[in-house]
């Protein structure tokens, strides 16, 4: 959404000894996104801390500022959900507008100034709700469902960031990494992953276009450079991904983990190797 799979960044043109460059910024047209879930809404905050810190990513910023997020409270959480582990309320997305779909009716509540502005523009399309008890009942039912899910009592171990070296050198990586296929699926479905590559393409005589595209830290050539690859082995790449999620990112972002408990990696990993399994293994390991 704010960090698309592929985006054009620049155009270059060489005429003789003259080089001209054109920056291709996203459209300034307002985009409205309907149905954002609470876990994905939280992921935007995590990405903001990456792309909106100095130096600010102008492409991400432009999309972020021109987008209105309309969240929708969860009514049917997946069995792989564990957003509660990060203090996320699945029934109240952190968006400009919160909505709830109950028995064919859409309940709407503006939260931010941007949400209020959109609500005002909708005018007579919306009407004041006389009774919101149905929303409360749905929220209570959702919480009951969450309380019996397989990961309802799962929590991350708060001591991990304080023991960075021990976590890095743990034997857990040697036990888990061999099962990884390096298929990169987990990184592509994760809403907080943000690795990318930059590619230049010749599109005509003296003309070049630069694109940014998603990449994966699990790929064997992700860190490959002219002088070699600092993470040649699968174990090193596997460890790097989870060290970033569980240790490095929290250390630099007020203790916030780079995970929102959406459960997509649990659903999609072909060998059932995911962040929950890694975190649990580290928690019970004797060398952490």
Residue spans for each PLM region:
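Iron-sulfur-associated redox domains of electron-transfer enzymes in respiratory
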Residues: 1-163
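Short alpha-helical basic/polar micro-motif
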Residues: 37, 184, 188, 267
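Hydrophobic positions within alpha-helical membrane elements
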Residues: 42-43, 189, 268-269
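Ferredoxin-type iron-sulfur electron-transfer modules in oxidoreductases and energy-metabolism complexes
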Residues: 156-178, 196-288
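Basic (Lys/Arg-enriched) interaction patch that binds polyanionic ligands
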Residues: 178-198
């Amino acid at each position: 959404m704010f960090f698309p799979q592929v985006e054009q960044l620049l155009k270059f043109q060489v005429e003789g000894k003259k080089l001209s460059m054109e920056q291709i910024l996203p459209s300034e047209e307002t985009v409205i996104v309907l149905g954002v879930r609470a876990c994905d809404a939280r992921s935007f905050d995590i990405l903001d801390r990456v792309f909106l810190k100095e130096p600010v990513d102008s492409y991400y910023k432009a999309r972020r500022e021109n987008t209105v997020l309309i969240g929708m409270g969860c009514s049917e959480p997946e069995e792989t959900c564990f957003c509660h582990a990060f203090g996320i309320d699945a029934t109240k997305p952190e968006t400009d507008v919160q909505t709830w779909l109950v028995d064919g009716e859409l309940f709407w509540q503006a939260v931010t100034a941007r949400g209020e502005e959109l609500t005002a523009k909708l005018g007579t399309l919306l009407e004041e709700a006389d009774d919101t008890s149905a929303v409360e009942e749905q929220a209570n039912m959702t919480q009951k469902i969450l309380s019996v899910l397989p990961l309802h009592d799962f929590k991350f171990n708060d001591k991990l960031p304080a023991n960075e070296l021990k976590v890095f050198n743990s034997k857990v990586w040697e036990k888990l990494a061999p099962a990884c296929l390096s298929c990169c699926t987990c990184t592509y479905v994760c809403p907080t992953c943000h690795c990318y590559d930059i590619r230049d393409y010749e599109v005509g005589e003296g003309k070049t276009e630069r694109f940014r595209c998603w990449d994966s830290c699990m790929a064997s050539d992700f860190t490959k450079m002219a002088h070699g690859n600092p993470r040649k082995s699968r174990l090193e790449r596997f460890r790097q991904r989870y060290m970033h999620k569980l240790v490095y990112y929290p250390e630099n972002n007020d203790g916030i983990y780079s995970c929102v408990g959406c459960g997509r990696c649990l659903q999609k990993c072909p060998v059932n190797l995911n962040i929950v399994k890694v975190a649990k293994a580290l928690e019970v390991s004797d060398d952490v």
